[in-house]
Regions:
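Small-residue-enriched hydrophobic alpha-helices in membranes
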Residues: 1-163
Length: 164
């Protein structure tokens, strides 16, 4: 995966990191939070300096930038790494935000469902009830996403402190 990601621009990798951190924000902060952040930086081949110099994007900017990714393996990796924290949190607002995110990306629904099923099996967790046709069109799901952006900032701060 690192080889595929290394072909992307640093900007695109920063947008992917932003998406991952939003969904990581649904999990409780614990001793693994810092480790997950460091793993994200490593696989995305980003440094503390890269993250500090990247302007914090809005949800719309994240979606607009990631939407154009066409590599199936990379899409699968993004869905797996955004869905697994949602599964672990067992929070309905997290699931609604994830479904809204998937809907906004406009990627193949069957591809997303297959990846979700694989992720559920990987983490040996029961699936949460989801229905792509009933994704809310209002801002309720998005507001949950925006509230997690604050957690994104906290995670970046933790990573920054840890890497100093």
């Amino acid at each position: 995966m690192k080889r595929i990601l290394s072909k992307l621009s640093k900007e695109t990798r920063c947008y992917i990191l932003s998406a991952l951190m939003i969904f990581d924000g649904f999990e409780e902060l614990d001793y693994t939070t810092e480790i997950r952040g460091e793993m994200h930086l490593d696989i995305l081949d980003l440094t503390k300096s890269d993250v500090e110099n990247f302007a914090i994007p809005s949800y719309a900017q994240i979606v607009a930038h990631i939407k154009s990714i066409s590599d199936y393996e990379l899409r699968d990796w993004i869905i797996t790494n955004t869905y697994s924290p949602v599964l672990k949190s067992r929070r309905n607002d997290a699931l609604q935000t994830f479904l809204k995110f998937c809907s906004d990306l406009g990627w193949d629904v069957n591809e997303i469902k297959d990846t979700m099923k694989t992720t559920e099996e990987l983490w040996d967790l029961k699936p949460m009830n989801y229905n792509f046709r009933n994704v809310p069109a209002n801002n309720d799901a998005t507001s949950g996403c925006f509230s997690t952006i604050a957690i994104f900032f906290i995670c970046i701060a933790i990573i920054t402190i840890a890497l100093q």
